[in-house]
Amino acid sequence: MSWLDKLLPPKIKQTDPKSRKGIPEGLWVKCPSCEAVLYRNDVDANLHVCPKCDHHMRIGARERLDGLLDPEGRYEIGQEIVPVDTLKFKDSRKYPDRLKEAMDETGETDAMVVMGGAIHTLPVVAACFEFSFMGGSMGSVVGERFARGAQNALEQHVPFICFTASGGARMQESLLSLMQMAKTTAMLTKLAEAKLPFISVLTDPTMGGVSASFAFLGDVVIAEPKALIGFAGPRVIEQTVREKLPEGFQRAEFLLKTGAIDMIVDRRKMRDEIAQLLALLQRQPADALA
């Protein structure tokens, strides 16, 4: 040991790399809007809304329903219905392979979850798209679950609510998926005849066959802030008309300004706002929300 080593403080001992504790994956989330780095638990507690800029991130169907419905008395509708490859469809991959991958990634059997329950004790049936499952595409299972949810609302004589988050009809089911547009709108006609409220909540994104069928048929049509809503995507429209679209075109704020939707509601206030609407539509007393 040299005289210089004796003067210097002892070195910090190196630990075995295998014994070091790393930061768990997914502990932090980056806001896609303001790019702030956020603690995941804070984001989850805030219903996936950025606490810095209020950007509404995409949220899973079950998380959304957990934040909407009262904890007691929930029941799922149509979970036993699963997709089948009736057409033996194959593009770059087989349809069953795509389904299996989506099921493994999301834990769901298709792109919609339907539950019965209550919002501030007011009984409802609520359907919600799972965008992570093949882009929330509407196939025969989604259409059937929607129809069964509406039928359950008819039988229970309660309002029906649907949160949309979809790229449109599922191409792997071809005409079968397009038939769901007629099927879902027909069920809403029955709800209207029974004078039962249907509230449609448009979230990011609501496109294609979903926006062209039942999404805008609500007695009240709500959207989340800055949600992308339309039929064809903005890039497709620009390429077709060969013109630059206005800023904010197909966003919720643009649709509210032009009268296509009724209101924009922050996700954190959605439960209370829907409860107030239901009480108003059903002529419930004010103390029903206590």
UniProtKB/Swiss-Prot annotation:
Report the pathway entry: Lipid metabolism; malonyl-CoA biosynthesis; malonyl-CoA from acetyl-CoA: step 1/1
Q: Which GO terms describe its biological process?
A: fatty acid biosynthetic process; malonyl-CoA biosynthetic process
Q: Where does this protein hold Zn(2+)?
A: 31, 34, 50, 53
Cofactor comment text? Binds 1 zinc ion per subunit.
| Gene Ontology MF, one | zinc ion binding
Q: One Pfam family of this protein, by short name?
A: Carboxyl_trans
Membrane-spanning regions, if any? none
The answer to whether the entry has keyword Ribosomal protein is no
**Keywords associated with the record:** ATP-binding, Cytoplasm, Fatty acid biosynthesis, Fatty acid metabolism, Lipid biosynthesis, Lipid metabolism, Metal-binding, Nucleotide-binding, Transferase, Zinc, Zinc-finger
| Xref: Gene3D superfamilies | 2-enoyl-CoA Hydratase, Chain A, domain 1
CoA carboxyltransferase N-terminal domain sequence ranges? 27-290
User: Cellular component GO terms, alphabetically?
Assistant: acetate CoA-transferase complex
- Required cofactor names: Zn(2+)
Known catalytic reactions: N(6)-carboxybiotinyl-L-lysyl-[protein] + acetyl-CoA = N(6)-biotinyl-L-lysyl-[protein] + malonyl-CoA
Q: Start and end residues of each C4-type zinc finger?
A: 31-53
Q: Which InterPro entries match?
A: AcCoA_carboxyl_beta, Acetyl_CoA_COase_Trfase_b_su, ClpP/crotonase-like_dom_sf, COA_CT_N, Znf-ACC
- Primary role: Component of the acetyl coenzyme A carboxylase (ACC) complex. Biotin carboxylase (BC) catalyzes the carboxylation of biotin on its carrier protein (BCCP) and then the CO(2) group is transferred by the transcarboxylase to acetyl-CoA to form malonyl-CoA.
- Quote the subunit structure annotation: Acetyl-CoA carboxylase is a heterohexamer composed of biotin carboxyl carrier protein (AccB), biotin carboxylase (AccC) and two subunits each of ACCase subunit alpha (AccA) and ACCase subunit beta (AccD).
This one is known as Acetyl-coenzyme A carboxylase carboxyl transferase subunit beta
